[in-house]
C-alpha cells in the first residue's frame, strides 16, 4: 500500500470516480511487474514475461479505440490483426494492469477503515494458518458442519454489475466489458466450467478480484443479518466498502423476510453458528439440529438464485456430523474426534472407574492427494515411487538441489500444523530421492554411488529451519526435541496456498 499512496497524489474524487486515466500511466504496469516478481509463490518463481511492458500496453489500448473495435463482432476476430496469435499475451497484459487499477480504491479504503481501530498486528490475520486456531477453539463445541460449494456466476456480466456498485467510473467498466467481449465471447460463458477455468488461469489476479467482489456482495448481506441477530459487533464489518443501493437491498430483504418467511427468521438467532470461506468453498458449522442445518441449506440455495442470479442446487451443500466426518480444508483433513481417558476414583473401600471422552480437533495431511500432486508434477509415479526430473538435468548441481530443497521446505512449512508427521516424512523421502535420481541421471551414475560420494550433505540440505534449530538445542535427538517437533505449529507468514498442497 505504500507504493499506491506514494504514486497516487490524487484527491478523493479522482481516486474514486476516474480510474480510467490510470490505465495509461507508466507506474501502473511497474506495480503489476513488481507484483509478478514479488508475490508469494511457494514453489518456484517463474518471473515475468520479458515481452510485457507498459509501452506495449499503452499502444495496444490506443489501437483498440483507433480501430473502432467496439463494432467488430467476435466472429470476425479471427481475421482481426489485433487479435492474432498474440491474443493471450495481450489479454494477460491488459488484465494485469486493470487488476492493479481496480484494486487501488479498495485497498486505500480498507486501510483507512482500519486506521484508528485497536487491531494488533492485523497483517497476521492475512495468514492462511490464522484460521486453524479459530477452528480448534470453536469446532470442539459444534455438532454439524456443511461443506458448501459456492456457485459461479452464470454470466460474466454479473461480475461487472457487482463491480458497478463499488467502482463509480463508467469508462473503466466499459473497457472491462469490451475486454471480456473481445477476448472471451462472454455470450457463450453460461457457466461452462471449462471456459471459466481457462479465463481464471490466464487472468488469475483479475478473475480473483472480480469473483471475490461478487462473493463479498452476498456475504455482506448474509453476515449483516447474522450480526444483527446476535447483537455482536463484527470487526471485519467496519472494513466493508460502500456500495450503491446496498441499504436499499437490505431493506427490501428485511421486508421480504418479515412478510413471507416469518418462520425461518429464527435461523439467524443461533449464537453457535460459524462461517468460514476459502477458495471456492465455504464451511457453515453449528451446534444445532439436522433440521436447522437443512433449513440453512435451502435458504442459501434460494438466497443465491433469487437475489444474485447464480444457479445452485441443494446437492452442492453436504451436511455431516462432526464426530464422524472429516472435511477437506486448505490442504488439511480436519475432524473432531473423541480422546478417551479412564480415571480411577476410590472412596473408602469402594473404587470407581470413570470413562471420560474429551473432544480433540485433529488435523492431518492427506497423503494420497498429496502424492497425486507430486506425481502430476513428475516427482514420483502414482504409487509414490520417486522418479528423476529430466527437465532439471541441464541445470547445475547446486541449482537442482536448491529447487528441490525449496519445494520440500515450503511443503513442510505449510503442513507444519499436522497432528501426525508421518505423511511429511514420506513426502520428504520422495523429494530427497527424486533429487538424488535427477543428479545421478545427470552424472550418468547410480543413486547408491552418487549418495555414497555426496555423503550426508544432501540429507542436511532437506532439514527445515525448525529441525535445524531443535538439533542445535537438543543434540542427539532427545525425547524433548522429538516431542516439540511432533506438536502443531502455525505460522503467520503464509498468505497463499501451495500449489502442491491444493488438491482441487
UniProtKB/Swiss-Prot annotation:
Keyword set for this entry?
Answer: Chloroplast, mRNA processing, Plastid, RNA-binding, tRNA processing
| Gene behind the chain | matK
| One cellular component term from this protein's GO annotations in UniProt | chloroplast
Q: What is this protein called?
A: Maturase K
Its predominant location is: plastid
Cysteine disulfide partners in this protein:
none
One Pfam match, given by its short name, reads Intron_maturas2
Function, as annotated: Usually encoded in the trnK tRNA gene intron. Probably assists in splicing its own and other chloroplast group II introns.
Q: Which GO terms describe its molecular function?
A: RNA binding
Query: Which InterPro entries does the record associate with it?
Result: Domain_X, Maturase_MatK, Maturase_MatK_N
Localization per Swiss-Prot or TrEMBL:
Plastid, Chloroplast
- Protein family according to the UniProt entry: Belongs to the intron maturase 2 family. MatK subfamily.
Q: Name one GO biological process term.
A: RNA splicing
Amino acid at each position: 500500500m505504500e507504493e499506491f499512496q506514494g504514486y497516487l497524489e490524487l484527491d478523493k474524487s479522482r481516486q474514486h470516480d476516474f480510474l480510467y486515466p490510470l490505465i495509461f500511466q507508466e507506474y501502473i504496469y511497474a506495480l503489476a511487474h513488481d507484483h509478478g516478481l514479488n508475490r508469494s509463490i511457494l514453489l518456484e518463481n517463474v518471473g515475468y514475461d520479458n515481452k510485457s511492458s507498459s509501452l506495449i500496453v499503452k499502444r495496444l489500448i490506443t489501437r483498440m479505440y483507433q480501430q473502432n473495435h467496439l463494432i467488430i463482432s467476435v466472429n470476425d476476430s479471427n481475421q482481426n490483426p489485433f487479435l492474432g496469435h498474440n491474443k493471450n499475451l495481450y489479454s494477460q497484459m491488459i488484465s494485469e494492469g486493470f487488476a492493479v487499477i481496480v484494486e487501488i480504491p479498495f485497498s486505500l479504503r480498507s486501510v483507512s477503515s482500519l486506521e484508528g481501530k485497536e487491531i494488533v498486528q492485523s497483517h497476521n490475520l492475512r495468514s492462511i494458518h490464522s484460521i486453524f486456531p479459530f477452528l480448534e477453539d470453536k469446532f470442539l463445541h459444534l455438532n454439524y458442519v456443511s461443506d458448501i460449494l459456492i456457485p459461479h456466476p452464470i454470466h460474466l456480466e454479473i461480475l461487472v454489475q457487482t463491480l458497478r456498485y463499488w467502482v463509480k467510473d463508467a469508462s473503466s467498466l466499459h473497457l472491462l466489458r469490451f475486454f471480456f467481449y473481445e477476448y472471451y465471447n462472454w455470450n457463450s460463458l453460461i457457466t461452462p466450467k471449462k471456459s471459466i477455468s481457462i479465463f481464471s488461469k490466464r487472468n488469475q489476479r483479475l478473475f480473483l478480484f472480480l469473483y471475490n467482489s461478487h462473493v463479498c456482495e452476498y456475504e455482506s448481506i448474509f453476515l449483516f443479518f447474522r450480526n444483527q441477530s446476535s447483537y455482536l459487533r463484527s470487526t471485519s464489518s467496519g472494513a466493508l466498502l460502500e456500495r450503491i443501493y446496498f441499504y436499499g437491498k437490505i431493506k427490501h430483504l428485511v421486508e421480504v423476510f418479515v412478510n413471507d418467511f416469518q418462520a425461518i427468521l429464527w435461523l439467524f438467532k443461533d449464537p453457535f453458528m460459524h462461517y468460514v470461506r476459502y477458495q471456492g468453498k465455504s464451511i457453515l458449522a453449528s451446534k444445532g439440529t439436522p433440521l436447522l442445518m437443512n433449513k440453512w441449506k435451502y435458504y442459501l440455495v434460494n438466497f443465491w438464485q433469487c437475489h444474485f442470479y447464480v444457479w445452485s442446487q441443494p446437492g452442492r451443500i453436504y451436511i455431516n456430523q462432526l464426530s464422524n466426518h472429516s472435511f477437506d480444508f486448505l490442504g488439511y483433513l480436519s475432524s473432531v474426534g473423541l480422546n478417551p481417558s479412564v480415571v480411577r476414583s476410590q472412596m473408602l473401600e469402594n473404587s470407581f472407574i470413570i470413562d471420560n471422552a474429551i473432544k480433540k480437533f485433529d488435523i492431518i495431511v492427506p497423503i494420497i492427494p498429496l502424492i497425486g500432486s507430486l506425481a502430476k508434477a513428475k516427482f514420483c509415479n502414482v504409487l509414490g515411487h520417486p522418479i528423476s526430473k529430466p527437465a532439471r538435468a541441464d541445470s547445475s548441481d547446486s541449482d537442482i538441489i536448491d529447487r528441490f530443497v525449496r519445494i520440500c521446505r515450503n511443503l513442510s512449512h505449510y503442513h507444519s500444523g499436522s497432528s501426525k508427521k508421518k505423511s511429511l516424512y514420506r513426502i520428504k523421502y520422495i523429494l530427497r530421492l527424486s533429487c538424488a535420481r535427477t543428479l545421478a541421471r545427470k552424472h550418468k551414475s547410480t543413486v547408491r554411488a552418487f549418495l555414497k560420494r555426496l555423503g550426508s550433505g544432501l540429507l542436511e540440505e532437506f532439514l527445515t529451519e525448525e529441525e535445524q534449530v531443535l538439533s542445535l538445542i537438543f543434540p542427539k535427538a532427545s525425547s524433548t526435541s522429538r516431542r516439540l517437533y511432533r506438536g502443531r505449529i502455525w505460522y503467520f507468514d503464509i498468505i497463499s496456498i501451495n500449489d502442491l498442497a491444493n488438491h482441487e
